Amino acid sequence: MILITDIISSPVGHALLQLLLSQKEHEPVRVMVTPYDRLSHEDGFEPVVSSFYDLPSLDRALKGVNTLLISTFNLFTDCRCGYLNLLHEAVAEGVKRIIFISSAGRGDSVSLPMQENRETEMHIQQSGIPYAVFRVNILMENLPFFIGTEQGIYYPAGNGRVWFVSVHDVAEAILPFVTGRFGVENRAYTLSHEITYSFDDIAAKLSQYYSGRVKYESVDLAFYRKTLLRMDIPEDTVDRLCSVAKAIS
């Protein structure tokens, strides 16, 4: 049994689920969902209502699981306490291996999501369960989170450059580890791209698809923060988004 922790907010989790279900023969798949997710067994997998903060529900989700795929998207939320609960229950239920979707970046990065993922990697190592960690760079599919939908990019990235990757390429690289075709060797792998893009480059690319020129303006970080707060985004989420912007710049 394979347990995927998130397919709703996680593009990687969703893409991996689709790849698993596309195979003629695959291990049974279970997915953690909330009571509000409209998913059923008819979708080809077993949805289980569970929360990182409800230990009995974690026990049910992990029952009979061999492979735990931690795919939860932590850009907006600190998941560390929930991950600790998950790891504790995974050890108790005899999970055989863990696949963790982490984030790429330097060890001294100011990005809060990346710092938290590094801490979680350490806890996974200490769990004693064989693991593979995949440090994924920013997904090109997540660009709207950073640049919005207007015909102008106003983001405090300066001249920073990013190795954007496609979620489909990432999922295909991870799939053999999830299915067991490749063994896990208690290693961390970085999934990135050989070409970097600045936000100026992105604006130039987008300009090819619009009638007018798409402009990039590197706004002040304080202005960006105030703008997000005016949108009624919770302050702790704003702090996370600002830390990512600062890391890119």
Protein language model regions, located:
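C-terminal helical cap and adjacent loop that interface with cofactors, partners, or active-site loops
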Residues: 249
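Short, well-structured alpha-helical segments
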Residues: 235-246
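Rossmann-fold cofactor-recognition segment
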Residues: 43-54
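Oxidoreductase cofactor-interface core, primarily capturing Rossmann-like NAD(P)-dependent enzymes
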Residues: 1-36, 53-56, 63, 74-81, ...
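N-terminal Rossmann-like NAD(P) cofactor-binding module of classical short-chain dehydrogenase/reductase
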Residues: 62, 66-69, 99
